[in-house]
Amino acid sequence: MEFSWLETRWARPFYLAFVFCLALGLLQAIKLYLRRQRLLRDLRPFPAPPTHWFLGHQKFIQDDNMEKLEEIIEKYPRAFPFWIGPFQAFFCIYDPDYAKTLLSRTDPKSQYLQKFSPPLLGKGLAALDGPKWFQHRRLLTPGFHFNILKAYIEVMAHSVKMMLDKWEKICSTQDTSVEVYEHINSMSLDIIMKCAFSKETNCQTNSTHDPYAKAIFELSKIIFHRLYSLLYHSDIIFKLSPQGYRFQKLSRVLNQYTDTIIQERKKSLQAGVKQDNTPKRKYQDFLDIVLSAKDESGSSFSDIDVHSEVSTFLLAGHDTLAASISWILYCLALNPEHQERCREEVRGILGDGSSITWDQLGEMSYTTMCIKETCRLIPAVPSISRDLSKPLTFPDGCTLPAGITVVLSIWGLHHNPAVWKNPKVFDPLRFSQENSDQRHPYAYLPFSAGSRNCIGQEFAMIELKVTIALILLHFRVTPDPTRPLTFPNHFILKPKNGMYLHLKKLSEC
């Protein structure tokens, strides 16, 4: 049978394309095979839990059950190799000496994990490395001086009181548990928008969720789903998927929102508007700080830098603090004796809570211990990661080669029975001055440590203290046993299906 002219004409190009694709696939398969062999060789000295040949250890994290990690920690008290699929492995550590060794260096953050973050964070302090990170850190540090932070206390208190007014109305109309995380999330967004932009969002008074908050929450879910879905690790496959399309759309929403506010402020400054002298501005917001920051040579942030740093402040400050506040309330609800002791302390310092000052926050010693113990028990950011730029040798002599991604499990460190006695027990006295002085300096790392520790940790502690103090002055919180909580293994530990607590208005206030 003879081939037609058309069949003959197209046969050769199709054949060549087939051979090319086959060769490309073969090269990729060889590359992946060699990568797996290298990882197996590098991680062989370290014992690990049994792993599935294809899925690796994914089941430990896909079940949203942090208790499985605790079981591993009891068996492997320092570290273990962690596989996601057959070709990607991390080295997970949760020992204070191991943590100190890692964080005392200047290894860059994991590029593999960084690609899962929203694009608008790609140039901010949280993602930068090397000289540019150092320059940004130096320029931003004055913005977190206590003289700047003091002015935020009144802003925070105002937003918290708006939330408490909502709770009072709810409690007067129903005798059921309240989903508090939604309210705390909106309140935290309200605070961060005011501190970042001096922007009134009305997100607490609106019956519908703020579009910005909705975009942030949905992005977080997409990032988590992509991280633990092997197919979506490919940038091409992810971008062509419905989730990838949604990811890009949500990122554009956030970019446009931030850009609009920045451009409005720059136009005002160029027009000579002295915003600090207007009645609504009693403080210097974060955007002011970023726009006015200059180093010794007079260099300032570029437009992209301004956008990235403001976005980082918004995202890092909103989500993590909403989660932390919620978990503190949850722990105090489960431990009423500690809740009552905190309330008595706050009453003795604040009275009716009509005003709150920097010095008063410093007097809340027991409340601070309860906040720290919650951040140990349920760290809002459960892990951080680094790509080793050179070989790393731990104090016990074990060595990792350059190129390995090391994940410091803060959850694992804070629940390591070799580090903490009875780690699942809520015990604020762990953070008394005496006990803190005796503890390993790298045993408690809710804000990381070393040169890359969280630049906003003082801001965070102020918001946590102000919020918890005012809530305890006006409400007693008790758990809802019909709605147990789980700890989903996300980038940020947030209540998976909301947080329901019983709220009782206190008549004394």
UniProtKB/Swiss-Prot annotation:
Entry cofactors: heme
EC number: 1.14.14.-
Keywords: Endoplasmic reticulum, Heme, Iron, Lipid metabolism, Membrane, Metal-binding, Microsome, Monooxygenase, Oxidoreductase, Transmembrane, Transmembrane helix
Signal peptide: none
Keyword check for Cytoplasm: no
Expression sites (tissue/organ): Expressed in brain, heart, kidney and skin and, at lower levels, in skeletal muscle and liver. In the brain, high levels are detected in amygdala and lower levels in globus pallidus and cerebellum. In the heart, very high levels in aorta, but very low levels in other heart regions. Also expressed in breast, prostate and colon.
GO CC annotation terms, alphabetical: endoplasmic reticulum membrane
GO terms for biological process, alphabetical: lipid metabolic process
Alphabetical list of PANTHER family matching this protein: CYTOCHROME P450 4X1-RELATED, CYTOCHROME P450 FAMILY 4
Family to which the UniProt record says this protein belongs: Belongs to the cytochrome P450 family.
Stated name of the protein: Cytochrome P450 4X1
